[in-house]
Amino acid sequence: MAFASTRSSADSRFILGGLLLTLALAVLGSESACAAAQPSVSADNAANIPAPGEAPSEERAAQLWKNFADAEALDYRVDLLALQFGPAASRLPGAAAVTGISAEPALLAKFFAAAARQGLSFESAVNQVPEPKSLDLMTWGIVKVGSAELMDLDPKTAGRTERTVRTVVLGERMRILKRTSVTASDAPGWALVQCLDGRLGWISESWLALKNDMAFVSWNRQNAAVMRRPNTELRPENGDALVFAEAGIQLYQLEHQPDYWEVLLPDGRKAKAAGTALEDVSAWQQREEELRRSSPSAYLKALAASAEGLVGSKAEVLGAPLPVVVLRMHDLLAPADIDRLARLGAPLSGERDGAELKAGDLMFFGEHDEPQSAGIWLGEGRFAAVDPQTDRVAVLKLSDLRQNAKKTKTLGTFLWALRLKPQELQNPCLLSSRSHPFFQTPPAELKRCQLR
């Protein structure tokens, strides 16, 4: 009887277990049927679906990039760091794809670190320029034509709007960041370059004497002669048409006689110039540096005297804003964009009729705090600037400008002045040729400017 009781209990448990199993299978079958009736969601897609109210990762990354660029005061004219964002192929949470171009590895790393703190990660295909260096890589260029156009976009980009950034001139050095391939029709390639003041742009390689690092070092080590004034006339020895070089341009010195100089042009031709038109670079650099260090006020007065000496010159002959040209004449390289030049230091109001100003101060004119033109203060209520009515350098009076609505309309309202500190060349935006990285042996990269 005891055996029969034990068996009966076991049978009961077996029957109960079977019933529970049947019920579980029925429930699972019902859930499977419901799932089949709903749209399927893959694990990858589910992982990439943002939380309710949260933007997709690529949109979050784009907004973070905009905030970062604003905080770092990135300027597309001088900062080569352009990024675009899209969905990540991995579909992982917080991931986005990033493409673009960068010549600022430190800034790019800083942005990636900021993104990581926000829970973002990237599948990066950013094109880093310049390319890894090799002995054969052409990393430098020297303008070999009288003047050439620097463009703001790659000319091979479809749908671009062609716009000239500025004119670059014979003998101007530039760093090559990226080169395009020669087209099938044998048209010249183009190069993305960085100019002496950091300005970026595209230029046809046919206008450049291309050099690798070794050749550029050799060029920098040669004795050179500097152009003392704008539009210096150079006569090639083979009877070719005259070429002209701008103030501050340095060319390889071949021979110096009392009545002439012979120099080597970037394209390999020899040319001669009048004896008073050029000067030995070493002597020029030393004289200007000694004056900057020993008497900054005397140096600024020399700027004013040179500006007044250019009165009557056509604006097109200058090739750059008047203050930039005058600074080059005295071995200072400054931004050629007026709005960047105007932010080299603290502004001076000038007070009424320039009572606060001193000879050599830079002056800026425009509308709504946006500089459009520039001049140099001469003293006694006068300044030198390109008169928009004649398109020539002229001596103008600040009091007349305020009373002459027509001239104010074209030149612009006086905004502020700026007094340089030529004895303190620590800002990469204001350098002598001796301290500029492109003139070093070996040459080096140009650091970011410090603007207010």
Predicted regions and their residues:
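SH3/SH3-like beta-barrel superfamily modules
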Residues: 97-99, 164-204, 243-276
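Catalytic cysteine-centered active-site loop
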Residues: 312-358
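Glycine-rich catalytic cores of cysteine/serine-nucleophile enzymes that process amide/ester linkages
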Residues: 168, 230-234, 240-261, 265-272, ...
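Beta-loop motif signature
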Residues: 142-176, 180-183, 224-253
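N-terminal secretory signal peptides that target proteins for export/translocation
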Residues: 1-12
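N-terminal targeting leaders
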Residues: 22-165, 205-214
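Boundary regions of SH3-family modules and the immediately adjacent low-complexity/disordered segments
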Residues: 113-135, 194-228, 261-301, 305, ...
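Aromatic- and glycine-rich peptidoglycan recognition patches
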Residues: 215-217, 223, 232, 236-240, ...
